[in-house]
Amino acid sequence: MGVEKIKAAFENGKKAFIPYVMGGDGGLEKLKERIRFLDEAGASIVEIGIPFSDPVADGPTIQRAGKRALDSGVTVKGIFQALIEVRKEVQIPFVLMTYLNPVLAFGKERFVEKCLEAGVDGIIVPDLPYEEQNIIAPLLREANIALIPLVTVTSPIERIEKITSESEGFVYAVTVAGVTGVRQNFKEEIHSYLEKVKLHVNLPVVAGFGISTKEHVEEMVTICDGVVVGSKIIELLENEKREEICELIYATKQKEEA
């Protein structure tokens, strides 16, 4: 469980496909059902969003999903309960994407305890600066839960090395400046940025933000170790276009054999 389980998703040249689902969008039964579907479809890790009223890193699609979840009365406690229940049925690693505020409001010790109970293997906190990681990092380390770092196009290499030196799991490389969301294409400099990150860190590098097509997936996994797809997954789940999700997963796995 925990850090080792995330490591296993990248072993032997495996390319990781990491779909993002908003916890409680459509209800908690829907969350469990979607996790079961993504596990069966061959996703490597599932990223579960904790809805928050001020989601600074989220684009419009994810913001709307979070608002739907909050409007329906979904709570952090409820999401943990759903994860505890579905964990009995699936082995796929769970990574939580949460802003710092919900963690502190819930109580950080209690939050980490619930992560353990629900079989959460890693967490991403996009608004937690590296300099303030000690707010939660020691508790997570003790629980063998990875605190996954985000690096951006504008991060100098020295900072990337510093941020990732004590990290575990994988490095989340943000591929665009700005918020999440669907994009048409990626600029050339993104390629050199990802190659630079790969060169300077000792963890798998996963690209995320704006990845929405098979072409994007193929492009990104030739350079790095996996992709996170968020806004597009929410859109496809909402419109019941699940075969397109399977195609994105297939596009990732094809690159393992290349």
UniProtKB/Swiss-Prot annotation:
GO terms for molecular function: tryptophan synthase activity. Pathway: Amino-acid biosynthesis; L-tryptophan biosynthesis; L-tryptophan from chorismate: step 5/5. It holds the Pfam family Trp_syntA. Keywords: Amino-acid biosynthesis, Aromatic amino acid biosynthesis, Lyase, Tryptophan biosynthesis. It catalyses: (1S,2R)-1-C-(indol-3-yl)glycerol 3-phosphate + L-serine = D-glyceraldehyde 3-phosphate + L-tryptophan + H2O. Tetramer of two alpha and two beta chains. The alpha subunit is responsible for the aldol cleavage of indoleglycerol phosphate to indole and glyceraldehyde 3-phosphate. This is Tryptophan synthase alpha chain. The lineage of its organism: Bacteria, Bacillati, Bacillota, Bacilli, Bacillales.
